[in-house]
Amino acid sequence: MSFPGEIILELRGLTAGYGGVAAVRDLDLAVAPGEVVALLGPNGAGKTTTLLAACGLVPALAGSVHFAGQPRSRQVERNARAGLVLVPDNRGVFHSLSVRDNVRLAARGGAADEVLDLFPELRRLLGRRCGLLSGGEQQMLALAKAMLTGPRVLLIDEMSLGLAPIAVQRMLPTIRDLADRRGVGVVLVEQHIGLALSIADRALVLHHGRVALTGTAAQLRGDPRAIERAYFGLSA
């Protein structure tokens, strides 16, 4: 559920890329607390670059990023402490440590038990080394660790990468719940269009670094041909 009138993350005319070469061009995106926005598009469309530029890992070549009403810091760690948190596609867990130790490293105060209540499957795995977890379990742990930082916005990159569909289907409702019950804004990069649109409020389809299509999730679900045209850069 989104909250009209409030904006927690705003990208204004963002152009960003690598070595001075733009991978994203003139992108506008505003995210409200409690809103889930899906970024869709083929490989190389600029989805991950958008997330990395939003959190400060990739520099903006033009335009701006505002977080909580202020220009976003260039220091990634400062952004994370303020609540702008990236969940990368490599899952960001320490494979040589147990689930319990991963949670302890990320925990703030007594938040661990509260967050583990959101991921009850992890409680039975607390003593297991993370390298022995399935991909779905590692991704669940990555989300739990992100929640332990007290995020205001989660930037989730390719959550389903390499995971069985059943694992993805189990985690998506948790992301929706984080938005609805905790007011966390979410930007979700996802290749599975139907799954992304099942939890998103809005979606943008990127093609060659530009927004080719935008609308509510309901609008896009009702017009799959429009999504297909946007994916391949075809005119209406």
Where are these regions (language model features)?
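Conserved ABC transporter NBD signature motif
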Residues: 63-73, 82, 110-112, 117, ...
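Helix-to-loop junction immediately C-terminal to a conserved catalytic motif
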Residues: 55
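ABC ATPase C-loop
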Residues: 146-147
